[in-house]
């Protein structure tokens, strides 16, 4: 008995209902659960579990289709968990007085880094103001001059003694910027260099010997002067230190007292205090004007101001967590190498590159340290060296900030080398299954680092709870100025089943639904309607399809013009209408295709012309082999098959794969064998196994609509229709015009569960049971194959 689907079986008919208003709370939340998490119970459980584990290697990969709210899902759950956790410490880099090229890391309680930075900046300002005043005091100048006066007196005494000694040896002492030297005296007067050269050799020799004697005494005198200078400098330094200690100690002690509970910080502050006292000149130097005058005529001169010297006392606050109330949650879409681990910036002044610890800039790993970093798989795999850098960080548990050139080549680049930062972070990567498979297959560390996989479902069950949640979603994403009527809500629910491609499922790709909500509001406004009605939702869907279906329309034109030959009336032997689904990325549709078969006596078996031309995939080739198995199982238990048959997808130039046409091809082969014509106003789709059972296929809705559109274009006769697998009935979510045509008996949809059920529809003959009567399809095929075998045996 031929079964035909009733129009009520062709989609889910939603009941009109009002969008459910939600209580205003945190963004994205309803009365009971965040809207983006509807239907994601498995994912929620997996993510909650992953967030609880703090052990190394338990990072998270959220896997699912785009548009299902994966990022929002991960962010909201991470925020909820982060809110219960401690605020991580501030990260600061400070000057390393023992090794200036390697800035020192300070980890301080949240908020303390900001205060330290402010206190140190204030210290620099105050000392820059007070120390010059202190050292400009008259009392200080008097004490300093007294010390210097003693030195001057000693210098004068030593030089005077040297002058007397030199006179005894006929020399006069001369003092210059380059030091002390002696000029010979002849006949009571000093001589010039030219006069010395004009002297005889004997005179020169006498003067030279005298000079050697006096030079020895001069060396002793110079040593005495230097000793006095050292003593004087020490006394001046002690004076400066004592004076500076009062001013510096006053301010530094306040800072030290503030941070008395931080031993590591106290050690740094002690080093700061010692360095300031050793370099008081940096606060009171008067060399700035001189350097500015030099730079006026030598622009390339690298002026180093007092401010540059004082930079070493500043604090480079990498992360300021003073405003946080829990652990940080960072979401980013540009995880480049420098954005991940930070970078060291350089100043370029006339080709002279310079840097210091204050030019170390934080990256995402710094900002998210102690919390959660959410990245997109596509972004991190598409950015050079980003994945390798993230992997290294997770393996070593350290953030290493170094120039990219140094990381990639191993060649050291001159500059600062910051102390690595211990990392305590949970990485959440958002991506599709493809990227997960790539990482799992080609990176040995991936499964060791990302042990939690969160599978995000693209659909949810059709039940009252999920329908209610979907109604809340509609309310959440629409305004009171453009309310959705109950009929419009029903249309959105029906559209959700169409995206899911099942009557008993609702899509979780809420971005697709949100787009239709937005566009439906626009159509309602253009219609000057105070409410969004069902017709506005349907128009939004229709117009969206229209914007995307140009390629589909071009193929439809070719079918209408018979450039692509597909018959929709009459009967033909060895010719049948198949259906293929095409996906252009943002639009899916089906194209009817003519499949032909020839059959004749021989031993070649069934030859797939597409395979011979290297235009078929392995799954399609498997379908052909399944068909051969069916023929042998059904007809050749008592004799071998003596058959040659060729099957072909006509006008196929792009290749083909999949087994959804295996039953279609079988009908064409059997038609050619038994010479039974096939109705051309029927198209068929369905996979099969070797026992003739019809298996479900994908895209059933689009395939039915594809053949319907062709028949509608050529004119509906009332006899046209499509055969689909029985197991695909639940997948049908057809357009209203198809449903209306079925309702009016202008178009027909026949479900079948076995090959035998299709014969009465396609060939107007029963299948027949063994021993296969002559007036059945099996009987005609069986007799033809047996006659082939007998003829072959006679040969």
Language model features with spans:
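Conserved ASCE/P-loop NTPase catalytic core
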Residues: 2-440, 445, 451-467, 471-485, ...
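Peripheral, non-AAA+ core regions of ATP-driven protein-machinery
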Residues: 356-365, 371-384, 388-390, 396, ...
């Amino acid at each position: 008995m031929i079964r035909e689907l009733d129009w009520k079986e062709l989609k889910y008919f939603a009941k009109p209902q009002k969008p459910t208003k939600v209580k205003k709370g945190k963004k994205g939340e309803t009365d009971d659960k965040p809207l983006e998490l509807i239907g994601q119970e498995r994912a929620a459980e997996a993510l909650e579990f992953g967030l609880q584990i703090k052990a190394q290697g338990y990072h998270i990969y959220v896997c699912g289709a785009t548009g299902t709210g994966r990022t929002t899902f991960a962010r909201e759950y991470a925020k909820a968990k982060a809110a219960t956790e401690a605020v991580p410490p501030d990260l600061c880099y400070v000057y390393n007085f023992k090794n200036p090229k390697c800035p020192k890391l300070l980890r301080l309680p949240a908020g303390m880094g900001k205060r330290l930075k402010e206190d140190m900046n204030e210290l620099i300002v105050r000392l820059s103001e007070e120390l010059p005043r202190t050292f400009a005091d008259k009392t200080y100048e008097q004490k300093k001059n007294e010390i210097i006066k003693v030195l001057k007196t000693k210098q004068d005494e030593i030089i005077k003694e040297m002058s007397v000694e030199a006179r005894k040896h006929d020399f006069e002492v001369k003092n210059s910027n380059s030091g002390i030297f002696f000029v010979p005296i002849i006949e009571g007067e000093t001589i010039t260099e030219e006069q010395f050269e004009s002297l005889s050799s004997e005179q020169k020799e006498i003067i030279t010997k005298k000079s050697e004697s006096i030079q020895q005494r001069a060396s002793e005198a110079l040593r005495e002067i230097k000793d006095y200078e050292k003593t004087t400098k020490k006394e001046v330094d002690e004076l400066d230190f004592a004076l500076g200690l009062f001013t510096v100690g006053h301010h530094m002690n306040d800072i030290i007292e503030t941070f008395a509970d931080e031993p590591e910080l106290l050690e740094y502050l002690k080093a700061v205090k010692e360095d300031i006292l050793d370099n008081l000149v940096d606060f009171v130097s008067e060399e700035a004007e001189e350097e500015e005058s030099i730079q006026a005529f030598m622009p390339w001169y690298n002026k180093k101001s007092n401010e540059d010297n004082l930079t070493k006392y500043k604090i480079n606050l990498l992360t300021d967590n003073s405003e946080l109330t829990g652990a940080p949650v960072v979401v980013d879409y540009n995880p480049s190498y420098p954005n991940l681990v930070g970078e060291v910036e350089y100043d370029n002044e006339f080709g002279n590159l310079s840097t210091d610890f204050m030019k170390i800039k934080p990256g995402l790993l710094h900002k998210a340290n102690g919390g959660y970093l959410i990245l997109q798989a596509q972004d991190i795999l598409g950015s050079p060296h980003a994945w390798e850098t993230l992997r290294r960080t997770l393996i070593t548990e350290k953030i290493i900030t170094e120039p990219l050139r140094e990381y990639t080549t191993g060649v050291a680049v001159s500059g600062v080398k910051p102390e690595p930062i211990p990392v305590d972070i949970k990485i959440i990567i958002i991506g599709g299954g493809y990227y997960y498979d790539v990482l799992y297959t080609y990176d040995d560390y991936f499964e060791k680092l990302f042990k939690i996989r969160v599978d995000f479902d693209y659909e949810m069950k059709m039940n009252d709870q999920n329908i209610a949640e979907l109604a809340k979603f509609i309310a959440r994403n629409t305004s009171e100025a453009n309310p959705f009527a109950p009929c419009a809500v029903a249309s959105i629910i029906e559209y959700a089943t169409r995206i899911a491609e099942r009557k008993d499922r609702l899509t979780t790709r809420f971005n697709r639904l949100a787009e239709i909500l937005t566009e439906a509001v626009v159509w309602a406004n253009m219609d000057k309607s105070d409410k969004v009605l069902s017709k506005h939702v349907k128009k939004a869907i229709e117009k969206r399809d229209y914007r995307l279906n140009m390629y589909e329309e071009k193929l439809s034109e070719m079918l209408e013009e018979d450039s692509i030959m597909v018959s929709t009336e009459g009967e033909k032997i060895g010719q049948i209408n198949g259906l293929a689904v095409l996906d252009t990325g943002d639009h899916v549709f089906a194209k009817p295709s003519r499949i032909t078969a020839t059959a004749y006596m021989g031993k070649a078996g069934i030859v797939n012309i597409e395979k011979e031309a290297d235009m078929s995939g392995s799954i399609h080739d498997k379908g052909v082999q399944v068909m051969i198995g069916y023929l042998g199982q059904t007809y050749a238990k008592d004799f071998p098959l003596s058959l040659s048959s060729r099957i072909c997808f006509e006008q196929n130039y792009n290749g083909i794969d999949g087994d959804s046409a295996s039953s279609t091809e079988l009908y064409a082969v059997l038609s050619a064998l038994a010479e039974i014509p096939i109705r051309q106003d029927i198209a068929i789709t369905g996979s099969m196994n070797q026992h003739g059972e019809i298996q479900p296929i994908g895209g059933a809705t689009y395939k039915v609509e594809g053949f319907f559109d062709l028949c509608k274009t050529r004119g509906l006769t009332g006899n046209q229709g499509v055969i689909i697998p029985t197991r695909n009935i639940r997948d049908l979510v057809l357009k209203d015009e198809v449903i209306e045509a079925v309702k009016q008996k202008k178009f027909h949809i026949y479900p079948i569960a076995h090959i035998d059920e299709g014969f009465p529809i396609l060939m107007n003959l029963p299948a027949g049971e063994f021993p296969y009567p002559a007036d059945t399809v099996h009987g005609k095929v069986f007799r033809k194959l047996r006659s082939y075998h007998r003829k072959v045996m006679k040969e």
